[in-house]
Amino acid sequence: MASSSVSSLQFLFVTPQTPSSLKPNSTLSFFSLPSSSLNLSLSSSSTGLCSIKPFESSFSTRVALSGFDQLEDDVEVAEQPRFSEDLKLFVGNLPFSVDSAALAGLFERAGNVEMVEVIYDKLTGRSRGFGFVTMSTKEEVEAAEQQFNGYEIDGRAIRVNAGPAPAKRENSSFGGGRGGNSSYGGGRDGNSSFGGARGGRSVDSSNRVYVGNLSWGVDDLALKELFSEQGNVVDAKVVYDRDSGRSRGFGFVTYSSSKEVNDAIDSLNGVDLDGRSIRVSAAEERPRRQF
């Protein structure tokens, strides 16, 4: 079979056997792509399972202790179930050590986890630092977003964003909550507070700078930290692709005054951030996206 050009995916399905139980036993089944393009990693010690902030989860324990030496023929193969996009959460800024089992164990604290996908690079087999978690109900989705957006794992604050990828909106932000002003893949000309405050608040777009040539690993927090050196950052966001969840390599920072904007352009244009020389300029209504 010809090799696929997309990244390898790791799916973890959880199917409750006894719905009436408060803590039902679960069966685990894996949906797998051809073995050449799939990286299944279930380690009880070398993954992010043990590095997540301390909590006890019978589910994650069962995942960790499931047979590591189990033959491929013994793994149940199932078709990927279809779930409403409203039940899916995007989880970004994951440490590379966090796998599907660790992610499922964490999100189980917010409700019943239906499916977990951690996205892996096909060529390197390394986690790309983001994934998706599907819950059973919208209430559980909202609870998970509120509980885990900004939750720290291995020193990294993960991003959790709920809901399907909506049509483009003028008032949106990648980190937005469920107050109606959010975008799954990141806002274009978003008017929301930094960190995705629920409901959003207006910011003055005239005091905004465009930041290009960003490293894929730079997130909202890193952007805010750098630009805070030049003034009061009202809003800072990296723009993400709605389909892949990957950074598009640029973002926007909004200051409280035009002087801070000018200072940021003068001081930070060409500065090295995470190995790349960033471009900083005054933001236009429709910024030219040069990469």
From Swiss-Prot:
InterPro entries the record matches: Euk_RNA-bind_prot, Nucleotide-bd_a/b_plait_sf, RBD_domain_sf, RRM2_NsCP33-like, RRM_dom
Subcellular location: Plastid, Chloroplast
One Gene Ontology term of the molecular function aspect: mRNA binding
Record keyword Glycoprotein present: no
UniProt feature, compositional bias: Gly residues: 174-189
One biological process term in Gene Ontology: mRNA processing
Claim: Chloroplast is one of the keywords in the record: yes
GO cellular component, one term: chloroplast thylakoid membrane
Domain RRM: 87-165, 207-285
Top-rank taxon, per record: Eukaryota
First-listed, main subcellular location of the protein, grouped into a coarse class: plastid
Stored Pfam families: RRM_1
Chain spans, region Disordered: 164-202
Segments of this protein annotated with the region Linker (Gly-rich): 166-206
Coiled coil: none
Keywords, ordered alphabetically: Chloroplast, mRNA processing, Plastid, Repeat, Ribonucleoprotein, RNA-binding, Transit peptide
PANTHER family assigned to the protein according to its UniProt record, in alphabetical order: OS02G0815200 PROTEIN, RRM DOMAIN-CONTAINING PROTEIN
Function: Could be involved in splicing and/or processing of chloroplast RNA's.
Protein name from the UniProt record: 29 kDa ribonucleoprotein B, chloroplastic
Organism: Nicotiana sylvestris
